[in-house]
């Protein structure tokens, strides 16, 4: 068999003062990495002192140093990730805080505009820019409504709401309006209370007017008949004819008939005389 290439006696004790940490690890070193390197150096010292330990102990020491180094590097990565997460959280929290502030400012502006509309001190931007919007709205409100084709009747409790009953109520309302107009025309009718009494008063007043019209028509007939007759009636003035009694009218008519007979009688006698004379001859 060939002799082993490497013997335990060929390894010499390592001198830690002959090298530095910056030469071995050029990257920035954390506390975990330093602790791992220290463990590695200490394990090397233990390895040099123990001459009877085998290759298994050397491999175990190497594995421990590697695990320590990887653990330090992983802790650094986790710290970097944690710092990134914290920074992202801070940014998100600051952005959310700014959004909340902006939304709060908008709400305050809206609330202030709504509360200021009543006093006129604060107005929204649309009204301030338009200027005449408020006046147009007031003009539209002040415009009279167009006449409606239908009749609005308010139904009370217990009243029917069908078309027939609504039309009947509308008819009664029109009648009441006409009665109020007649009350204003007829003297003393405003003092009467009750529709029945008002109707009686209106009927009595209309009947009295009808009688007066009939009497005046009779007067006109008498005046017209007197104007068509001879000058005998001209002795009486026209204004006094209406006040004369009925007997006077009869005497006037009898005188007229007598005058007509007097005028017509000699003509009739003359005709008879002429006829007799002709026969005798």
From Swiss-Prot:
Its main location: nucleus. It is found in: Nucleus. Residues 77-88, 138-152 have a biased composition (Basic and acidic residues). Residues 159-209 form the bHLH domain. The keyword Nucleotide-binding does not apply. Coiled coil: none annotated. SMART domains: HLH. The keyword Transcription regulation applies. InterPro entries: bHLH_dom, bHLH_ZIP_TF, HLH_DNA-bd_sf. GO terms for molecular function: DNA-binding transcription factor activity; protein dimerization activity; transcription cis-regulatory region binding. Residues 47-167 are annotated as: Disordered. One of its GO terms (cellular component) is nucleus. It holds the Pfam family HLH. CDD domains: bHLH_AtBPE_like (cd18919). SUPFAM superfamilies: HLH, helix-loop-helix DNA-binding domain. GO terms for biological process: regulation of DNA-templated transcription. Keywords: DNA-binding, Nucleus, Transcription, Transcription regulation. Homodimer. This is Transcription factor bHLH79. The lineage of its organism: Eukaryota, Viridiplantae, Streptophyta, Embryophyta, Tracheophyta. The gene is BHLH79.
């Amino acid at each position: 068999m060939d002799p082993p290439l490497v013997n335990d006696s060929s390894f010499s004790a390592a001198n830690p003062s002959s090298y530095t940490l910056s030469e071995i690890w050029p990257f920035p070193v954390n506390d975990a990495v330093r602790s791992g390197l220290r463990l590695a150096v200490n394990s090397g010292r233990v390895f040099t002192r123990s001459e009877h330990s085998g290759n298994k102990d050397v491999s175990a020491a190497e594995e421990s140093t590697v695990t320590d180094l990887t653990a330090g590097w992983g802790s650094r990565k986790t710290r970097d990730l944690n710092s990134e997460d914290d920074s992202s959280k801070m940014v998100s929290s600051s952005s959310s805080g700014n959004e909340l502030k902006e939304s709060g400012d908008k709400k305050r502006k809206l609330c202030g505009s709504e509360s200021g509309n009543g006093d006129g001190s604060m107005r929204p931007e649309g009204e301030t820019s338009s200027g005449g919007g408020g006046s147009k709205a007031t003009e539209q409100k002040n415009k009279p409504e167009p006449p409606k084709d239908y009749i609005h009747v308010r139904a009370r409790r217990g009243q029917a709401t069908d078309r027939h009953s609504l039309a009947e109520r509308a008819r009664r309302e029109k009648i009441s309006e006409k009665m109020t107009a007649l009350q204003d025309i007829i003297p003393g009718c405003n003092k009467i209370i009750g529709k029945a009494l008002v109707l009686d008063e209106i009927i009595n007043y209309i009947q009295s007017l009808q009688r007066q019209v009939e009497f005046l028509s009779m007067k006109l007939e008498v005046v017209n008949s007197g104007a068509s007759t001879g000058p005998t009636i001209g002795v009486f003035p026209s204004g006094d004819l209406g006040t004369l009694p009925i007997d006077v009218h009869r005497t006037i008519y009898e005188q007229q008939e007598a005058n007509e007979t007097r005028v017509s009688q000699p003509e009739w006698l003359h005709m008879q005389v002429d006829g007799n004379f002709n026969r005798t001859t």
